[in-house]
Amino acid sequence: MTRLTVLALLAGLLASSRAGSSPLLDIVGGRKARPRQFPFLASIQNQGRHFCGGALIHARFVMTAASCFQSQNPGVSTVVLGAYDLRRRERQSRQTFSISSMSENGYDPQQNLNDLMLLQLDREANLTSSVTILPLPLQNATVEAGTRCQVAGWGSQRSGGRLSRFPRFVNVTVTPEDQCRPNNVCTGVLTRRGGICNGDGGTPLVCEGLAHGVASFSLGPCGRGPDFFTRVALFRDWIDGVLNNPGPGPA
C-alpha cells in the first residue's frame, strides 16, 4: 500500500471517527498498576468524577489534551495528583488543585490537530514518591517505529464500562510513520487487543522514560487501534516558553 493510499484511508477514518467521538477514558487490555508505578499521572475531574488524564511536567503545570475541555468547564474542574484508588480520599498521598490558567497552541478540533493543553495549577505541587515530574523529549526528537511504550490511566476495561477504581496500563508499540500523521505518534498492540478508548484523552504516552505523546483519539473499535497521540516533541519549545513565563497565581 502506498503512502498516499494510507494517508487517504486515514483521512476517511478520521472523518468517520470524529462523527462519533467523545473524550477518551478507557485503557483496554491493560493490567492493574502498582501504587506509585506512575507517580506523574494526573486525574482531571469534574465534581469528583475523573474525565481525562494528564501528566505533571513541572511543579505548576500538567500536560493534557485540549479536546478534554471541549465539553467540560475548567472553572469547576480540578486536577488530582498522587491518586491511586479513586474511591478513597487517600489524604496522605493525594493533592488536589484548581486550574489557574490554560494554554493551547492552535488546537484544531475538526482535524484533531495540535491536541495539547497545559494546565497551570493554583500552586506548586509538593513532589513526593507519589507525585513526580515526567520528563519531555527535546524539540523535534523522534521515536522510532517498533519502540515499546506504555500508556496508563483510569478507565473501564471495555468500551462503555465503568471507570476503573485503580489505574491500569498497557504496553504498546509505535507504528511506522506511513501509518500515522506527521503531527502524531501512533501506536498499536501487536498480539492482542489493547490501547486507549472513549474518554482517555490527555494521558501520556511514555517511551524510554519520556512523554512522547498525549492521547488524542483512536481509529476503529476500542483496543484495535491505531491510537493517535499528539507528538509532544513538536511543541517542546512552545512548552518551555509557557513554563518559563507562568501567568499570575490566584489573588
Swiss-Prot record:
Cystine connections: C52-C68, C149-C207, C180-C186, C197-C222
Membrane-spanning ranges: none
Gene Ontology CC annotations of this record: azurophil granule; azurophil granule lumen; azurophil granule membrane; extracellular exosome; extracellular region; extracellular space; intracellular membrane-bounded organelle; membrane
Species assigned in the record: Homo sapiens (Human)
InterPro entries per record: Peptidase_S1_PA, Peptidase_S1_PA_chymotrypsin, Peptidase_S1A, Trypsin_dom
Annotated PROSITE patterns: TRYPSIN_DOM (PS50240)
Modifications the protein undergoes after translation, according to the UniProt entry: Cleavage of the N-terminal propeptide which is composed of 7 amino acids occurs in two steps. The initial cleavage of 5 amino acids is followed by the cleavage of a dipeptide to produce the mature form.
Gene: AZU1
Main function: This is a neutrophil granule-derived antibacterial and monocyte- and fibroblast-specific chemotactic glycoprotein. Binds heparin. The cytotoxic action is limited to many species of Gram-negative bacteria; this specificity may be explained by a strong affinity of the very basic N-terminal half for the negatively charged lipopolysaccharides that are unique to the Gram-negative bacterial outer envelope. It may play a role in mediating recruitment of monocytes in the second wave of inflammation.
Keywords on record: Antibiotic, Antimicrobial, Chemotaxis, Disulfide bond, Glycoprotein, Heparin-binding, Membrane, Serine protease homolog, Signal, Zymogen
Effect of C68S: Loss of antibiotic activity
Propeptide segment residues: 20-26, 25-26, 249-251
GO biological process: antimicrobial humoral response; cell chemotaxis; cellular extravasation; defense response to Gram-negative bacterium; defense response to virus; glial cell migration; induction of positive chemotaxis; inflammatory response
Location of this chain's protein in the cell: Cytoplasmic granule membrane
Residues bearing attached sugar chains per UniProt: N126, N140, N171
Family: Belongs to the peptidase S1 family. Elastase subfamily.
Lineage of the organism: Eukaryota, Metazoa, Chordata, Craniata, Vertebrata
PANTHER family according to UniProt: AZUROCIDIN, KALLIKREIN-RELATED
Peptidase S1 domain mapped to chain residues: 27-244
Annotated membrane topology: Peripheral membrane protein
Protein's UniProt name: Azurocidin
Region (Possesses antibiotic activity): 46-70
